[in-house]
């Protein structure tokens, strides 16, 4: 099951795709994507529109994609996450990007790729983190995973305490 956190709202399910996009640059190209409920920085599907309001159909998976990939992803909206997400790739600006987002402990290959010429950013993001992460040790993904583990530990201790 996909492990996520929401910064401001309850999530309907941990296994559904949500369609909302983020405009990440003021350059000639914009970034579009899937994000987590409660995250900031989302806009409509149009590159000419930019606001921080979330679309009404948000669910919970964070998946940044170039607008050319929209037709590839739209068939999964509101459905169970497919076992293999490797087919979701950006265009030549972000070659060979993919991600396994089936559970917190296997979050990997989050990438952030920038084009200095256009100012556009392409990549994958993680729940609750504004922006993107990369594959380096400086990536916030470890903090995100550890935070989820700490949350589970706290919940376990809380339940034990109330049983005593």
Curated annotation (Swiss-Prot):
UniProt feature, compositional bias: Polar residues: 1-29
Recorded superkingdom: Eukaryota
Ranges for region Disordered: 1-62
Biased composition (Low complexity): 43-62
Protein name in the entry: Uncharacterized protein PB21E7.11
Taxonomic lineage: Eukaryota, Fungi, Dikarya, Ascomycota, Taphrinomycotina
């Amino acid at each position: 099951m996909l492990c996520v956190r929401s910064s401001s709202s309850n999530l309907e399910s941990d296994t559904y795709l949500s369609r909302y996009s983020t405009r990440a640059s003021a350059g000639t190209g914009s970034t579009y994507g899937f994000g987590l409920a409660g995250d900031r920085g989302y806009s409509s599907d149009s590159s000419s529109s930019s606001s921080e309001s979330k679309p009404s159909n948000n669910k919970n998976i964070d998946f940044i994609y170039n607008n050319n990939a929209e037709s590839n992803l739209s068939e999964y909206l509101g459905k169970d996450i497919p076992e293999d997400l490797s087919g979701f790739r950006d265009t030549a600006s972000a070659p060979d990007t993919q991600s396994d987002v089936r559970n917190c402990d296997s979050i990997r290959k989050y990438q952030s790729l920038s084009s200095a010429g256009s100012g556009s950013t392409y990549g994958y993001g993680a729940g609750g983190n504004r922006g993107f992460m990369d594959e380096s040790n400086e990536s916030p993904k470890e903090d995100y995973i550890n935070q989820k583990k700490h949350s589970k530990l706290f919940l376990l201790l809380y339940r034990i305490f109330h049983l005593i």
